[in-house]
Amino acid sequence: ALALSSDADQPIEIEADFAELDEQAGRTIYRGRVEVWQGSIHMTGDLLEADFDADQNLIKVKMTGAPAWFKQTPDNSTVDVEGEAKFIHYFKLDERVLLEREAIVTRGEQRFEGDRIDYDTERSVVKARALEPAAATDDKPAGAGRGRVRAIIPPKRNTPE
């Protein structure tokens, strides 16, 4: 799994320059140098919108930044998963992180880039999608640049026995 199993049992700690709580809507908004911690999870950004149910359980989070950033430590791993994008959505019930616009996810030397990266934290599955292919211009053919997903997967290193 992406997160340590104990992360969900930890309190959520949030720091920001400004906070606004709307109990009727079940939403809290934080602005300005926002930082979030929960167990091994650390997120930073400019704006955080957090939605809660009637029992004050977290449902989802949307972090906006230039870029917004997150880091998590997976179970049975010493290598953190890090991600950045203009928008990072965390869906607690689905155990899913969705990164949108200039999204990058890294784990050690592995790297995925795309317009949209969907990370299933429970099953450790990454799905990346590019922007629609760019139209042809004077200096680039149609489909060049933005319309691609990029992955870097290092070779497996043989360890001496």
Segments predicted by a language model, with ranges:
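Mature-chain termini and adjacent capping regions
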Residues: 1-161
